[in-house]
Amino acid sequence: MEIFPAIDLKEGQAVRLSKGLMQSAKIYSSEPSELAKRFEDYGAKWLHVVDLDGAFAGEAINFKTIEKIVKATNLKVQVGGGIRDEERIKRYLDLGVSRVILGSVALRDPEFTAKMAGIYRVVVGIDAKDGYVAVQGWGEVSNIKAVDLAKKFADVGVEAVICTDINKDGMLGGVNVDFSLQIARSSKLETIASGGVSDINDILALKATKEIAGVIVGKAYYEGRLDLKDAFKQVG
């Protein structure tokens, strides 16, 4: 199982939110590229980067900061937040990003998402509140169930699906293992769990399922609850 340290960007700074609320943003670093270097030193292979401003605005607000992060390390980087057209996908991949995360557009235009997955390295991000998909920076909840959306991308070339339980995100209250398993089993895709990781036990619980491909870690590290170096050693 892969651990993905997370860097969420707001106005060029690394922040964490609680339940996806922008007004809850807490700044952890004004030099996100230095954070990326630290994660690489700890043993990370992948980095999960989200342009929060982009998620709300629908455009690449923190592109320059992401460029700096990509150039600072040899980490593989997956990027999400406001990526809703082919031009932006190509722009990020040309920059050196390993793969892009499509979120809102996956719900609004699954045909486009499937087409892009057939051409480029695409991950689908499914963010859910009480089991239903949320979009537009989590500000809008649809009437589509997360498991039903995941099924749509089972055989179209999507590399993985990231499933986030919004109610858990940034709350340090434990990860929703059952939700992650529902997505993994319904889609048959590599599934990356996100939201609520509080310590090493949450990571080990996901690993123990043998059905979850990865986990995204943010606030648990930033708040000193998780020794990432040790986590990489334990997960292997």
From Swiss-Prot:
Gene Ontology MF terms: 1-(5-phosphoribosyl)-5-[(5-phosphoribosylamino)methylideneamino]imidazole-4-carboxamide isomerase activity
Cross-referenced Pfam families: His_biosynth (PF00977)
Active site per the UniProt annotation: D8, D127
Top-level taxonomic group: Bacteria
Keyword Amino-acid biosynthesis part of the UniProt annotation: yes
Pathway participation: Amino-acid biosynthesis; L-histidine biosynthesis; L-histidine from 5-phospho-alpha-D-ribose 1-diphosphate: step 4/9
Transmembrane segments: none
Keyword Cell cycle: no
Major location (coarse): cytoplasm
NCBIfam families registered for this protein in UniProt: 1-(5-phosphoribosyl)-5-[(5-phosphoribosylamino)methylideneamino]imidazole-4-carboxamide isomerase
Name of the protein this chain belongs to: 1-(5-phosphoribosyl)-5-[(5-phosphoribosylamino)methylideneamino] imidazole-4-carboxamide isomerase
Organism per entry: Campylobacter concisus (strain 13826)
Gene name of the encoded protein: hisA
